[in-house]
Amino acid sequence: MPKDILEIGKKDLEYYLQGIGTKNKFFSDSAYAILEESWLLGEGYKSYRKWLNLGGLGKWKNNWDCDNLAVSFKLYLQMLHAKHNPYTFTDRWKKKVENMTNVESVAVGVVYYKIERKGSSSMHAINMAFCPQGYAFTPEGNFHTLKRLYIEPEDGTVKKLTKKEEASIWYANF
């Protein structure tokens, strides 16, 4: 996991979800770690694929398809986050130890959207992640800006969703 981790609260994460079609947005935690794009698509994704291969799930199947891949990529990143931040509140207080971050989760979710092609349509599940993009300097203060990434969990590539596809997102879970 990266050394310097930005954090974002649920309300701020909701702000960055503006423009997607769904009202079905679910947040299971109150704060999230923002992962660097280069780590997420590089080392993070490569180690995820190794983990899948160890379990014999390295290839797409009818019963191991897009939704399973998207959920498992999110889960894998959450497992790494928990492993690298092992101390509970009690541990930190009694043993005087620190985690890299104390947020509950990573800012990688699962989204479902509609794909329309020449007279047919289907649903597809991918991952949505928020990564650092730069800085904004305002009278209210300086802050990091984030960018929304859509990741195809089958091959680890960034997908460019059209406005219509973003508007068709019917479920998002972080």
Provide a role label for each language-model segment.
Residues M1-F174:
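A structural boundary/capping signal
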